[in-house]
């Protein structure tokens, strides 16, 4: 077992951890943000885009396929119902087969399902395809949040999560602009604008899913882009997290028991 005391200050204060980092610890944390958060941010953009693009597609898709607002509402409901139901099973699979394999697999599958929506011919095919997107995409967000706990010490985890989640408002803001431009391609190569929308916003998830296989690692111990010293340093920080989570409560209780004035 590694000796965490060599890399962690003797009087460690979690609230001021960022001020107590050694140069190596800061270097490791910076590597994690550059390698993981930037890439995961891009993944989440396309994940969120595949959720909301049906709203943009509905502007013209309804007229072409004879769909009304109720049908689009049901398609949205079916997506979120399957998304909620399959979230936990998907995370279980992630822990069984590994983050890299599972995230890559579900990205490719939901990318295919989202892209295939361009071939929808009516309400039933739309319902089925949106359910498939919900099933396959369900494990992505909770899976990534779990994945980040494998890499980031507790103090930096909130920042990592926040930077990753910024993709949601960014996608919402830019999605309407990009989707509006894609819809203007209506008639190109005899495809409707909404067909181009599902193709150009869905297929990138397939390509990114393939990239996940080569870019992500299941754990720090398997990361070739971290040196042996980096891995040791990160493990010491993670070990210290567990110590600070366990020790303070017991330490305070022990200290309180020793203060006789409290019991007078």
Ranges and model annotations:
Residues 129-166:
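Cytoplasmic helix-loop-helix junction between adjacent transmembrane helices
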Residues 35-69, 175-179:
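Extracytoplasmic
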Residues 66, 98, 119-125, 136, ...:
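Helix-breaking motifs and short loop linkers at transmembrane-helix boundaries and internal kinks
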Residues 85-124:
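Conserved MFS/SLC helix-loop-helix module at the cytosolic interface between two early adjacent transmembrane helices
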Residues 52, 80-88, 138, 172-173:
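Residue-level signature of mid-helix packing/kink "hotspots" within the transmembrane helices
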Residues 2-52:
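Cytosolic juxtamembrane N-terminal segment immediately preceding the first transmembrane helix
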Residues 158-183, 187, 204-205:
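Glycine-rich segments within core transmembrane alpha-helices of 12-TM secondary carriers
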Residues 164, 190-251:
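Central mid-sequence intracellular linker of multi-pass
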């Amino acid at each position: 077992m590694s000796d965490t005391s060599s890399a962690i200050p003797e009087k460690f204060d979690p609230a001021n951890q960022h001020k107590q980092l050694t140069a190596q610890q800061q270097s490791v944390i910076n590597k994690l943000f550059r390698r993981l958060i930037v890439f995961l941010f891009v993944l989440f953009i396309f994940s969120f885009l595949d959720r909301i693009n049906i709203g943009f597609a509905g502007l013209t898709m309804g007229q072409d396929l004879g769909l009304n607002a109720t049908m689009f509402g049901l398609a949205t409901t079916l997506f979120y119902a399957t998304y909620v139901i399959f979230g936990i099973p998907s995370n279980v699979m992630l822990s069984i087969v590994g983050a890299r394999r599972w995230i890559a697999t579900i990205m490719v599958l939901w990318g295919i399902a989202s892209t295939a929506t361009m071939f929808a011919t009516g309400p039933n095919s739309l319902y089925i395809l949106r359910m498939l997107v919900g099933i396959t995409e369900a494990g992505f967000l909770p899976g990534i949040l779990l994945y980040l706990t494998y890499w980031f010490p507790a103090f930096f985890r909130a920042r990592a999560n926040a930077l990753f989640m910024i993709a949601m408002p960014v996608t919402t803001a830019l999605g309407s602009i990009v989707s509006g431009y894609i819809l203007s391609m209506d008639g190109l190569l005899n495809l409707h604008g909404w067909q181009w929308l599902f193709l150009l916003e869905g297929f990138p998830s397939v390509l990114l899913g393939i990239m996940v296989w080569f870019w992500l690692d299941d754990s720090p111990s398997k990361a070739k882009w971290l040196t042996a010293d980096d891995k040791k340093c990160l493990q010491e920080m993670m070990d210290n997290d567990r110590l600070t989570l366990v020790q303070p409560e017991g330490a305070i209780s022990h200290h309180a028991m020793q203060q006789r004035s409290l019991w007078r």
